[in-house]
Amino acid sequence: MLRLEAEWLGERMARIPDNDLFPLLDLGSSTLEYRTQTQPYIERNIFAPLRARGGIVYHLDVKPEPGVDIVGNLEDPAFRARVSRMQVRSVLMSSLLHYLHSYSQVCDMVTSLLPAGGYLFVSGPFSHPHDADPIDTMFRPSIEEIHRCFPGTRMLDSAIIDGGNWRNWDAAERGGRSLERTVLRLLTPFYRPEKWWQVARQSPYIFRHLTATAVVLVKDEQSPF
């Protein structure tokens, strides 16, 4: 997630009353370390303000790691039924669609978890290099494409967020690497070549801008899900 993407999402959540927002399900949450140390702006802009409001947030991921409240896969019907019983009012689904081979099926499942009037916050890369964590389908949807992934919803807000290039990012967005260190790494392809390819794929963004798509959707009363 980009820093400005986290800020945008946090600002939109702040506008929604507690009774309409909570409980919130953070789908594909990753770990506490990732949210607070690897990308601390996620905690700062999204989850710390939500916690200050006293709302319930469930972090769901397939990884049984610290900071994951619910471990499982929504493609498992029994697990999906368990999550449905939690009666969440909103879902955050960030940086997840491009990891899914059957994203349309998962999107239908996510919509089915929400009541009519429930909120869905969706964001992900628009212009971004390949991210093999563990896979990347290179799905880089526009605003309209994201909306079409969730039939039975209407759009409340949307943006293409310009995260700038390498020179504009903070240390967390650079993965802890300085520009000088990155240039030096590009000069040593013979050392750990798999890691070198990761850096090489990102190198155009020393000049090009990373962008993200973000939308806020609400489930219709007449939704088929």
Predicted regions mapped to residue ranges:
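Conserved SAM-binding loop
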Residues: F22-A132, H147, L217
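S-adenosyl-L-methionine-dependent nucleic acid methyltransferase catalytic domains
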Residues: D18-L21, V88, P115, D136-M138, ...
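S-adenosyl-L-methionine-dependent methyltransferase catalytic module, highlighting the catalytic core
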Residues: H101-M109, Y119-F225
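Class I SAM-dependent methyltransferase Rossmann-like catalytic core
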Residues: M1-L21
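Short secondary-structure capping/turn segments at boundaries of alpha-helices and beta-strands
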Residues: R12-A14, N45-I46, Q202
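Short, flexible hinge/linker loops that cap or flank conserved catalytic cores
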Residues: D18, R51, F207-R208
